[in-house]
């Protein structure tokens, strides 16, 4: 499934804030060989190049549109296409940084453990993932998928992202190879204009596979049903806006 950089960047500031918060906890003053894994359109890569330099960071993604936008944004930075489930750097890295990508990678705990082997001693693995499958945005996706004439397209259940493991699983997986592991949650509260704005947000990520599965002929009806559910799930605040609650999980591990 292809992604849309343009749709993703409609909420660039909000999407980049967790990337900044993740980078703020990376205890490296200098990086000689760093990677932005799942770099998307380059908004997170730009944070890394601003801090460490354009020549020491490489962006990695699996989507052509995202890589094209990233290269346009940062023409002096290297980008490459790869599947993160099997990717390895050509040589050991100082920094493996991943903002909002490993929630899509099957068995990502094992992948993260393997990536620790690709770090120099003192190198850092820094990961952030949405932990929002129990939020109304995602519950409504499942309800909409199961409730319309398109439901047969979802009968296999393969689109439903698996919940993230508990924090203790990340400690258990990474601690044997780390001198330090930090795991924490942050809940972001984003004021949104209306239900349509929330739908536009999730159209850039979580809702996209559902729309693709429903088919072009059902797209507008699926969106209308989903938007109705979102409007019912998010009551307006005093000023009429809706508050989008968005939990995220952060992991920072320093290699022994």
Swiss-Prot record:
Enzyme Commission code(s) on record: 2.1.1.144
Reactions catalysed: trans-aconitate + S-adenosyl-L-methionine = (E)-3-(methoxycarbonyl)pent-2-enedioate + S-adenosyl-L-homocysteine
Single GO cellular component term: cytoplasm
Record key words, sorted: Cytoplasm, Methyltransferase, S-adenosyl-L-methionine, Transferase
GO molecular function, one term: trans-aconitate 2-methyltransferase activity
Classification via Gene3D superfamilies: S-adenosyl-L-methionine-dependent methyltransferases (1.10.150.290), Vaccinia Virus protein VP39 (3.40.50.150)
One Pfam short name: Methyltransf_23
Compartments reported by the entry: Cytoplasm
A biological process from GO: methylation
Database matches in InterPro entries: SAM-dependent_MTases_sf, Trans-aconitate_MeTrfase, Trans_acon_MeTrfase_C
Keyword S-adenosyl-L-methionine: yes
Family matches, as PANTHER family: TRANS-ACONITATE 2-METHYLTRANSFERASE, TRANS-ACONITATE 2-METHYLTRANSFERASE-RELATED
Similarity comment: Belongs to the methyltransferase superfamily. Tam family.
Function of the protein: Catalyzes the S-adenosylmethionine monomethyl esterification of trans-aconitate.
UniProt-recorded name of the protein: Trans-aconitate 2-methyltransferase
The gene coding this protein: tam
């Amino acid at each position: 499934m292809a992604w849309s950089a343009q749709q993703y960047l409609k909420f660039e500031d909000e999407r980049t804030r967790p990337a900044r918060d993740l980078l703020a906890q990376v205890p490296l003053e200098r990086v000689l060989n760093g990677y932005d894994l799942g770099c998307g359109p380059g908004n997170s890569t730009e944070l890394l190049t601003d801090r460490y330099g354009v020549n020491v960071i490489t962006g990695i993604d699996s989507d052509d549109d995202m890589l094209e936008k990233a290269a346009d944004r940062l023409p002096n930075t290297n980008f490459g296409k790869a599947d993160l489930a099997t990717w390895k750097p050509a040589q050991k890295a100082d920094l493996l940084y991943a903002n909002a990508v490993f929630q899509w990678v099957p068995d990502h705990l094992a992948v993260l453990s393997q990536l620790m082997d690709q770090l120099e001693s003192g190198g850092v693995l820094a990961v952030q993932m949405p932990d929002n499958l129990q939020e109304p945005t995602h519950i409504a996706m499942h309800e909409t998928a199961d409730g319309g004439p398109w439901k047969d397209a979802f009968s296999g259940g393969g689109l439903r992202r698996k919940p993230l493991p508990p924090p203790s699983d990340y400690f258990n997986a990474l601690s044997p190879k780390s001198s330090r592991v930090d795991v924490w949650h942050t809940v972001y509260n984003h004021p949104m204009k209306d239900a349509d704005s929330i739908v536009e947000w999730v159209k850039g990520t979580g809702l996209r596979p559902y729309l693709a599965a429903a088919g072009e002929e059902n797209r507008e009806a699926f969106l209308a049903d989903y938007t109705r559910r979102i409007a019912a799930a998010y009551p307006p605040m005093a000023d009429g806006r809706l508050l989008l609650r968005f939990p995220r999980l952060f992991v920072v591990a320093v290699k022994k």
